[in-house]
Structures are given as structure tokens and as C-alpha cells.
Amino acid sequence: MQVTFLGTSSGVPTRGRNVSSVALRLPQRSELWLFDCGEGTQHQFLRCDLRLSQLRRVFITHMHGDHVFGLPGLLASLGLGSTSNGVDLYGPDPLDAYLQGVLRTSSTRIGYPLAIHRVREAAEQNTVVFEDDDLIVTAAPLNHRVPAYAYRAEQKPRAGRFDIDKARELQIPPGPVYAALKRGESVTLDDGRTIDGRTLCGPEQPGVSVVYCTDTVFCEAAVQLAQGADLLIHESTFSHAEADMAFKRQHSTSTMAAQTAAEAGVKQLALTHLSPRYAPGNAVTADDLVAEASAIFPNTILARDFLNVDVNPSK
């Protein structure tokens, strides 16, 4: 997996940061997933090497404008500029009414299949939001002024390295059967032998996981969702000194994000959703927030627009 940050500011865009959006690249399936879609997200696509035509799923955390105002325009542009096979949207209950209202009142036609899925029940009952043979997405409710949800996208474990020399020793004919054996499946050959693919593969390879958590004040549900994740993307709207403001507005400080990362045992923390008050030249800057978080969770990085982060299996 590779994560590309398209917007890392909270509330409003700044000269250096757009509002919230994160792209998850899935090169093995030529797909792109989007987490939140603040105003101007489609413009961010034009400034990097992401291909809008690969967009397959969009996960919305909550219905505040800095997380959803870019969605109608992006979906409309996708219909005009590509041959999309369809997009699935996941989010809070009002997402459907919001999107259908905008499309209807603007007489916008989406010329491809568009499905909208409510995540509230799955998040509250700790069930699956999306699953296929390779990936699984779960969600958890957050503590914010409106219903909000964090998401976890995780690759399923994969069969280990296929031992082709051993397969040849067993006189297994090459061809399509090798693909099934590489997946660890059992195959019956033409000569009647049944071969268990797991005996021809090395140790199972763990998948990688990314958790996207915004907007929220510190909450245990986020800690549980992020357990052992390879990358936790967590909002850091305020500095530690602004903790009272964070509780009042139901946002996180840098130290709350770090506490979540530490308690969840994640591998890496990326701070995003930064208040414009921490712009360069101000008394407190984004670098200060990273320093605060790093004192609790050392492997902390600062997200910035167009930053790419490769997410690889832990060794």
C-alpha cells in the first residue's frame, strides 16, 4: 500500500495545506481509495500523479464541510472524464441525502453506478464495512460533535513464497495449477494426486494495515481499532497547551494522537488535520506539535499535502 496525503488542514484551507483527504493506492489491483473529500480535492489530483479514473471507493468520516464539500464535484468530474466502472461510498447516515440533494438541485447526472453504504451499524456492532478476498475494512465510532467514524483498511495474510523447485520435484505440471498452489489452495492433478499448496509455500506473509482517525477527542474506540496497525493517521488539531479547547470542540491534541498510537501499539503515527494557527512563522508551529507527540510516541511524522508514505509489512 501507499498513502498520499491530499489535504492536511483543519476547517479551512491554507496556502500550504488543503482540507482533509487521504488517498490509499492499491497498485496490485489498480485501484484508488479515498478517505474524506474536502473542498478542492479534485484540484489536488491535478497536482500529483494520482489517476482519478482508478477511484473505486470513498470513505467519509463525518459530515462537516471540510471533509465532504469536495465530493459532489469530484464525482461529477469522474463521470465526465473517464469510463468508471462504479464507485462505492461509505459514511454517516446523512451522506446519501446530502449527495443526492446536491446532485438533484444542480441537475448533475452521474453516468456510472454509484452505491452509498451507511457505516453506523457496522461501526457500533464491530462488524465489517467492506471485505473481499484481499482486503477488509472496519470502522469505529469516534467522539465528535456530530457522528464520526474512524476506518481501518487491512490486507489479509498472504501465502508465503512458492517453492517452484519443490513443485518440479513433485512433477507438478506448470500452468494454471501453479496459481492455485501459490495461493495455498489444494489441487487435484490429472494423475489423481491431491497437492496441498500450503506445503509448497513458505511462512504466511502478514498484510499491512492503515487506520484513519478524524475528527475526535481521545477515545478508547480509536485505540481498539488501531491495535497493531502499521500506520495510524490521526488528527492533531491543537497543541497540548490547547487541551481545554480540544475537549470543548471535540478534537485531538498532538499528545492525544500520540497517546492513541502508544496504547494501540502502532508502528508509525502521522499527524494531520492541523489548525491554521500553527502555520510557519507563528509562535507555535506544526513542528512543535510533532515534538510534543514524539515525546510520547517517537515514530511520529508530520503529514503535509502530497506526502507519500509507503506502508510495508513489519519485519
Curated annotation (Swiss-Prot):
InterPro entries named among the record's database cross-references: Metallo-B-lactamas (IPR001279), RibonucZ/Hydroxyglut_hydro (IPR036866), RNase_Z/BN (IPR013471)
Record's keyword terms, sorted: Endonuclease, Hydrolase, Metal-binding, Nuclease, tRNA processing, Zinc
Binding site for Zn(2+) 2: 66-67, 215, 273
EC number: 3.1.26.11
Reactions catalysed, as given in the entry: Endonucleolytic cleavage of RNA, removing extra 3' nucleotides from tRNA precursor, generating 3' termini of tRNAs. A 3'-hydroxy group is left at the tRNA terminus and a 5'-phosphoryl group is left at the trailer molecule
Residues involved in Zn(2+) 1 binding: 62, 64, 144, 215
Cofactor binding summary note: Binds 2 Zn(2+) ions.
Cross-referenced Pfam families: Lactamase_B_2 (PF12706)
Swiss-Prot/TrEMBL cofactor(s): Zn(2+)
Annotated TM spans: none
UniProt-recorded Gene Ontology molecular function terms: 3'-tRNA processing endoribonuclease activity; zinc ion binding
PANTHER family to which the protein is assigned, alphabetical: ZINC PHOSPHODIESTERASE ELAC PROTEIN 1 (PTHR46018:SF2)
Subunit structure: Homodimer.
Stated role: Zinc phosphodiesterase, which displays some tRNA 3'-processing endonuclease activity. Probably involved in tRNA maturation, by removing a 3'-trailer from precursor tRNA.
Record-given protein name: Ribonuclease Z
Phylogenetic lineage: Bacteria, Bacillati, Cyanobacteriota, Cyanophyceae, Synechococcales
